Amino acid sequence: AGLLRAPAAATLVRALRERFDLPVHLHTHDTAGGQIGTLLAAIDAGVDAVDAACSSMSGTTSQPSLSALVAATDGTERPTGLDIDKVFSLEPYWEAVRTIYKPFESGLASPTGRVYFHEIPGGQLSNLRQQAIALGLGDRFEDIEDMYAAANRILGNIVKVTPSSKVVGDLALALVGAGADPADFEENPTRYDIPDSVIGFLEGELGDPPGGWPEPFRTKALQGRAAKPRHTELTPEQESALATEPRRTLNQLLFPGPTREFEASREAYGDLSVLGTIEFLHGLEQGTEYEAEIEAGKRLILGISSVGEADRQGMRTVMCTLNGQFRPVTVRDRSITADVKAVEKAD
């Protein structure tokens, strides 16, 4: 989150140096805007490595500016050894890349000192804003920040790093969405619909928190729930799959929900990673041709020839081109409201 102040960084690095004969590597985000000072203090104290970001991608929920760090340490006893002109030359490229990913920005136009209050990690802040927008809470982000601080306190001020930070974020979103009073929730948690991630945390799925369990809240929240085993044994099939498909199997074990969604998408649409970033995130422009290499030496030429009018169900016929051949595709235009109600099909 970028909560480590410069004096504390110096104290921490020196203490680690005295106790451990290991490299010390400092990573911090720059949400409040003061972390270049923290890095410099850590460098003076003997840190071995620090993380920084290309200037055009730096600041706020990212890392401090690499250009600033190189310039600040040049001529000192501990320079980075990087050529500052070469570092500068990277900035235009990453500035262009950043415009492509603009929809996923955190929404922070400048540093904010509120991070010292709500303690939302930098990597989570942008994700949390996108989650809030998806839940229709995008215009209540200050309320979510306040509730995040309350949720963090209720859960015992836990160490917030994935996946524990998600637990706090899920609870904050749920309480804001329900219009809940955090004090009442803490006193009477069984009256509320508690997110699964919070229940899992309280049941010990993430291990025992360093500061102990938040009691009596934990006991109240788990009241009437059947205890789950702390560890799940792998089936013979899963053990075999780990040897042959380790990445896919680990995804299924660690993130079952997102993995199912990903595999359903790939089953329906194929491997979309062959598309360019702009085409994938922003769609195809009518009248423009695109190339996609689906395998070594095999390229497809894609395009959109025309887009038909929407019908009462909000469906449009899009005339696509594939290697010069026309292919009609019917898609739902989610920007318009359909007149006909959709009925869920039975299994």
Question: PLM features: residue spans?
Answer:
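Catalytic cores of alpha/beta
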Residues: 32-47
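Core active-site phosphate/anionic-ligand binding loop and the adjoining beta-turn-alpha structural block
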Residues: 37, 62, 71, 80-137, ...
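Terminal or standalone catalytic/regulatory effector modules within metabolic enzymes
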Residues: 109-112, 119, 123-337
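Conserved, mostly hydrophobic/aromatic
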Residues: 46, 69, 148
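Hydrophobic faces of well-ordered beta-strands that scaffold small-molecule active sites
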Residues: 22-28, 50-52
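Short, small-residue-enriched loops and turns at beta-alpha junctions
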Residues: 2-7, 30-35, 56-61, 114
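Structured functional modules or segments
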Residues: 343-347
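Active-site-adjacent beta->alpha loops and helix N-cap segments on the catalytic face
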Residues: 2-20, 59-68
